[in-house]
Amino acid sequence: MTEKLLDVENLTMKFGGLVAIDNLSFSAAKDQITSIIGPNGAGKTTVFNCLTGFYKATAGSMFLNKENERLNLKRFSDFKVAQKAGVARTFQNIRLFPQMSVLENLMVAQHNKLMDASGFTILGLFNARSFVNKEKEAVEISKYWLDIIGLTHRADDDAGDLPYGDQRKLEIVRAMCINPHLLCLDEPAAGLNAKESAEL
């Protein structure tokens, strides 16, 4: 039997009088791909926004089964969903930092563990051992994912200078840098050609 990773029950999201999600229930299994399919405006992105803490759902529940814990995603503030629950996402419209390098975009994704290692103090600037070790680890993780998508040679280039398909791949591996327990991809193949879609 497949282990459940995510349980969403009676999820509702209202914006004033507009009902964006109406009593949605579904589950996702561990190590499986689950798709949310619907026309434009059906609320697919809103579901991801609720799962990742960008929106607080009006009603319903969202539970993530992580190791020996059952985490209530509604209890986490937005950035804590990624940090504590291990939920990462990509966006329908690519959201990179275009003036930052390709490598820096991947390092930014790992800022929570770097901040934790510095003790949220200035010690990180003075080469505190834990910070330096975590920084090296973050660079190695970034290099690993750049190698996977074939962009190691572009590591120092501005992310905004990459072709569209490479930007899409970079956004996906940026989410992978935190080793997510749940990865939400919002129209990940949008704008990709057939070859790029197959690679994805």
What is each of the regions a protein language model found here?
Residues 2-200:
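Glycine-rich phosphate-binding loops of nucleotide-dependent enzymes
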